[in-house]
UniProtKB/Swiss-Prot annotation:
Keywords: Phosphoprotein, Ribonucleoprotein, Ribosomal protein. The modification Phosphothreonine is found at residue 75. GO terms for molecular function: mRNA binding; rRNA binding; structural constituent of ribosome. It comes from Arabidopsis thaliana. This is Large ribosomal subunit protein uL6x. Pfam families: Ribosomal_L6 (PF00347). InterPro entries: Ribosomal_uL6-like, Ribosomal_uL6-like_a/b-dom_sf, Ribosomal_uL6_a/b-dom, Ribosomal_uL6_CS2. PROSITE patterns: RIBOSOMAL_L6_2. GO terms for biological process: translation. The keyword Phosphoprotein applies. It comes from the Eukaryota. GO terms for cellular component: cytosol; cytosolic large ribosomal subunit; cytosolic ribosome.
C-alpha cells in the first residue's frame, strides 16, 4: 500500500545554520561545518518556520512512498540530528587495550593523525593506522591503556575506531580464548549538556 504523503519535522537549535540545496544538507555550528548528501533517497527537504512557536524547522516529505521510503524519513532525520550534534558538541569514543600476557604498546604520531601498534600478541610486526579526515586521537592521561578519538562527524570517528579494531584481529587462534585487541569501551559527546 502506498501512502500519499508522509512527512516529519525536526526543530533546528539556535546557533546552528542549515542550508538545503537539492538534497545536499549543509550544517554549520560552533565546532565547524558538515555536509551530507541525500540524493539516493526519494525525499523532499524544506526549511520552514513553525507557525505556533516561531522556531526554525526542517521538514522531510515522501510522496507516494512505500513502507521503506516512509522509513527512510526517520533515517534522514537521525542523520541530520547527528550532523547537528557534531557541529555543536562533537563525538568522543574511548578505546581500551585488552591483553592477557604481552602488553600492547601504542604510539601516537603524525600530529595526532595516526597510531602505531607494537607487541600485539608478542609479534614484531608494527601495525600503523591512519585516522580519517577530521578525527583526532590522543592518549588518556587518567586511565592506563586507553586512547580517545574525537571529531565532529560520527561516521568518520566510528570508522576510525573500526580500523584500529580490525588491525588487532587475532588470526589462526580461537578468538574465544585469545581476547587480545583494542576495543571501544565508551561512546559519547565531547561537550556534555548541562
Amino acid at each position: 500500500m502506498k501512502t500519499i504523503l508522509s512527512s516529519e519535522t525536526m526543530d533546528i537549535p539556535d546557533g546552528v545554520a542549515i542550508k538545503v540545496n537539492a538534497k545536499v544538507i549543509e550544517v554549520e555550528g560552533p565546532r565547524g561545518k558538515l555536509t551530507r548528501d541525500f540524493k539516493h533517497l526519494n525525499l523532499d527537504f524544506q526549511l520552514i518556520k513553525d507557525q505556533v512557536t516561531g522556531k526554525r524547522q526542517l521538514k522531510i516529505d515522501s510522496w507516494f512512498g512505500s513502507r521503506k521510503t516512509s522509513a527512510s524519513i526517520r533515517t534522514a532525520l537521525s542523520h541530520v540530528d547527528n550532523l547537528i550534534a557534531g557541529v555543536t558538541q562533537g563525538f568522543l569514543y574511548r578505546m581500551r587495550f585488552v591483553y592477557a600476557h604481552f602488553p600492547i604498546n601504542a604510539s601516537i604520531d603524525g600530529n595526532n593523525k595516526s597510531i602505531e601498534i607494537r607487541n600485539f600478541l608478542g609479534e614484531k610486526k608494527v601495525r600503523k593506522v591512519e585516522m580519517l579526515d577530521g578525527v583526532k586521537i590522543v592518549r588518556s592521561e587518567k586511565v592506563k591503556d586507553e586512547i580517545i578519538l574525537e571529531g565532529n562527524d560520527i561516521e568518520l570517528v566510528s570508522r576510525s575506531c573500526a580500523l584500529i579494531n580490525q588491525k588487532c584481529h587475532v588470526k589462526k587462534k580461537d578468538i574465544r580464548k585469545f581476547l587480545d585487541g583494542i576495543y571501544v569501551s565508551e561512546k559519547g559527546k565531547i561537550a556534555v549538556e548541562e
